[in-house]
Every structure is written in C-alpha cells, then in structure tokens.
Amino acid sequence: MATRIPFTESQWEELENQALVFKYLAANMPVPPHLLFLIKRPFLFSSSSSSSSSSSFFSPTLSPHFGWNVYEMGMGRKIDAEPGRCRRTDGKKWRCSKEAYPDSKYCERHMHRGKNRSSSRKPPPTQFTPNLFLDSSSRRRRSGYMDDFFSIEPSGSIKSCSGSAMEDNDDGSCRGINNEEKQPDRHCFILGTDLRTRERPLMLEEKLKQRDHDNEEEQGSKRFYRFLDEWPSSKSSVSTSLFI
C-alpha cells in the first residue's frame, strides 16, 4: 500500500504562506500584501478545483476581474493605485494632481493644510487701549474756555471778551464765556487730578498779572506826558523874549 501524503499541494502552499506571515509578525515587520492575498484566496476563487485556481494565481498576468480591491491590508485599507500622487481629495471624485512630497502623503500645498486651517480662521485679537490723555483742543472745548480769552492787541492793551456766546471768526476773536453755562459740566480727570480746577485758575492768574503789568506801564507813560505838559511852550518863550 502506498503511503498517502498528509497534505495536498494546495494545503502545503497555504502552510508555507502562513509560516512566512508568522515570521513577519514575529519580527514586528509589515506583512507584504501578496501573502495576505494568498490567505484570502479561498474566498476569491471558486472551490471547484484547487489546481486551476493555483495555476491562475501564479500566472504572470492576473485576470482583469481582480482590481485594486483585491490587495487589501490587514486593517481594511486599500492600496493606493497611484502611490506618488497627492492624496488630498474632496471626498468624492476629485483628487489633487500634484506629486506627493518625499516621505509624505500630500504635496507641499496640502501638507500643512489642517494645521494652518484652525489658526487662519481665528479673528485677530483686538486690543483696546484706554484713552487717558486727551488732546489739548478737545480738552479746552469740553472745559468751556479757550487760550485766547484775553487777547493782547498790538498797542499793548488787553482786550477781553464779554457778553453773549460768540463764534470763532477769521480775525482771531475769541468765544464768550457763556458757552460754559450752555454746555453741561464735563470734567476731565487724568490720574486723579481735575484739569478744570487746576489749570483754569492758573491761566486766569497769569492773564491778570499781565494785564496789571500793562496797566502800570500805561499809567507811567501818562505821568511822564503830564510832567512835560507843565513846562512852558516854545511860543510863549519867544514872545516873552521879544516883549522884554
């Protein structure tokens, strides 16, 4: 009686294939796709004859019935049909036509798309700086007085504005002080000090000192003229000399 082989030829091929897969797993290396394809061969081919299936598998050209869906990895991922092409897609049929960057799945344009997307959509932070120091013009208008309240004329006398509210004219005239009564009280505080209570009395005091000084000069000039008027005129001196 002839001894029978415990395994058939197809079973022996499957055992060798499983041994190779085990070696890859023991070495902690990725398993080649063709070994996984051999394991799934019974589900892909008909079980009519093992010889015909093996001959069709080991043929140099595969039948067109088997597409890229046959080469599946262990985690269910399909092998890329164009491995050198960028994998950026819109989720449907469109795919980027540029070549992938070395050691990357995407091109240079789509490599950092996800990282920069969140930061680019954020609006820039707005910085609010409190305006503590106001302009001199706005501060003067709010306080209700101007610097030219006392205007000095070319002759030396001081001209003050009085009466009802007046508008600024082209000739340099000043506003009336009644504007302060019409406007509500607006105080300007800078670091705990009130500009109205500190600056306005100082300015008025300087204007009053200037006016007193000009008045003294004017009175001195008048006294000098009166002293000269007491002397006899030249006509009277001539007449007296002729009379003698």
UniProtKB/Swiss-Prot annotation:
All residue ranges annotated as the WRC domain in the record: 80-124
Ranges of residues in domain QLQ: 6-41
UniProt-annotated location(s): Nucleus
Coiled-coil segments on the chain, per record: none
Upper classification of the organism: Eukaryota, Viridiplantae, Streptophyta, Embryophyta, Tracheophyta
Family label: Belongs to the GRF family.
GO cellular component term of the entry, any: nucleus
GO biological process: DNA-templated transcription; leaf development; regulation of DNA-templated transcription
Placement of sequence motif Bipartite nuclear localization signal: 77-95, 113-122
Disulfide bridge map: none
Comment text on domains: The QLQ domain and WRC domain may be involved in protein-protein interaction and DNA-binding, respectively.
Main subcellular location: nucleus
Disordered: region residues: 107-133
Compositionally biased intervals (Basic residues): 110-120
UniProt source species: Arabidopsis thaliana (Mouse-ear cress)
Tissue distribution of the protein: Strongly expressed in actively growing and developing tissues, such as roots, upper stems, and shoot tips containing the shoot apical meristem (SAM) and flower buds. Also expressed in mature flowers, but weakly expressed in mature stems and leaves.
Function: Transcription activator that plays a role in the regulation of cell expansion in leaf and cotyledons tissues.
The protein, known as: Growth-regulating factor 6
Keywords from the named record: Activator, Nucleus, Transcription, Transcription regulation
Pfam families in the record: QLQ, WRC
A Gene Ontology molecular function term of the record: ATP binding
